[in-house]
């Protein structure tokens, strides 16, 4: 409790000390000149001088108040959380706007669905991400239900060397299949299959789907593949993506496997 109070007292003081200070007849000196507007609580605190005894008394009052009203702490934390989320959302909107071309229309990206769709969903994913596996049916359902949906896949291989290897194979496979018809089968089998994804497994899936393996093994180490993955990673960093799956729908970043219904709502809101 003491550690909480050490954090809470400065916050609570802004609210509580202003009326308390006014009641102290021996404490503060009045400002030299009256401000044009009533001073804020923070300004009042800045211009008040309390003795050590007065500070102890005030801290005791605050402590008693917080013990009697612990919901104040929760309210303060909720308000701070809301403020932070609003700031994060505003920053994300600005980042999406400034990276619009690369995010939605890069020449390196994988596009599923309608390339000219009126709504675009971008997904950052990792082939070894359990939550991405869980979210795969959501993507397939959305693509089947909406012929105007453009779905962009961005590689974000952060779950180890196997993920990086799988990403290289996947990007090389996309290079052979600009339409995405074979790629989506590859993507489903690799992401939806059991066991860890790595170079060996990704190549086996690519062979099963019918890609040109000689070309693929050459392409997977090409500058094109490296550039694609680097571009995706830089975008993820700019957007503050720290886990997968993370979606961009319209001007909003949506974190996690939120489910089909919420994705539908986000898509509808962005139309």
What are these regions (language model features)?
Residues 101-119:
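A short beta-strand-turn-helix
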Residues 2-101:
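N-terminal targeting signals for export/organelle localization
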Residues 4, 25-59, 63, 204-271:
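C-terminal cap of thioredoxin/glutaredoxin-like
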Residues 45-52, 60-64, 122-128, 155-159, ...:
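Second-shell loop/turn segments in exported
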Residues 122, 133-207, 237-242:
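Structural alpha/beta surface segment adjacent to cysteine/selenocysteine redox centers
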Residues 52-56, 67, 119, 130-133, ...:
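Soluble non-cytosolic domains of exported or imported proteins
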Residues 129-133, 245-248:
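The canonical Cys-X-X-Cys-His
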Residues 60, 64-75, 79-82, 86, ...:
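Surface-exposed, polar/charged faces of alpha-helical domains
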């Amino acid at each position: 409790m003491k550690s909480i109070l050490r954090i809470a007292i400065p916050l609570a003081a802004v609210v509580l000390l202003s009326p308390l200070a006014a009641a102290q007849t021996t404490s503060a000196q009045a400002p030299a000149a009256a401000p044009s507007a009533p001073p804020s609580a923070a300004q009042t605190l800045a211009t008040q001088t309390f003795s050590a005894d007065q500070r102890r008394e005030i801290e005791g009052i605050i402590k008693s108040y917080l013990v009697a009203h612990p919901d104040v702490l929760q309210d303060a934390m909720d308000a701070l959380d809301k403020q932070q989320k609003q700031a994060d959302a505003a920053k994300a909107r600005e980042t999406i706007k400034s990276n619009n071309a690369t995010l939605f229309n890069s020449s390196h990206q994988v596009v599923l669905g309608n390339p000219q769709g009126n709504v675009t969903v971008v997904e950052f994913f990792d082939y070894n991400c359990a939550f991405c596996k869980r979210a795969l049916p959501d993507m397939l359902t959305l693509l089947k239900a909406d012929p105007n949906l453009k779905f962009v896949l961005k590689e974000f291989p952060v779950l180890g060397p196997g993920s990086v290897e799988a990403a290289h194979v996947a990007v090389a496979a996309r290079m052979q299949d600009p339409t995405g018809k074979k790629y989506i089968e590859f993507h489903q089998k690799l992401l939806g299959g059991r066991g860890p994804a790595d170079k060996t497994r990704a190549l086996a899936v690519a062979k099963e789907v019918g890609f040109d393996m000689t070309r693929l093994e050459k392409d997977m180490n090409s500058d094109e593949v490296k550039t694609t993955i680097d571009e995706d990673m830089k975008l993820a960093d700019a957007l503050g993506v720290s886990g997968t799956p993370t979606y961009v729908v319209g001007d909003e970043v949506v974190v996690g496997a939120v489910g089909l219904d919420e994705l539908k709502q986000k898509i509808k809101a962005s139309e």
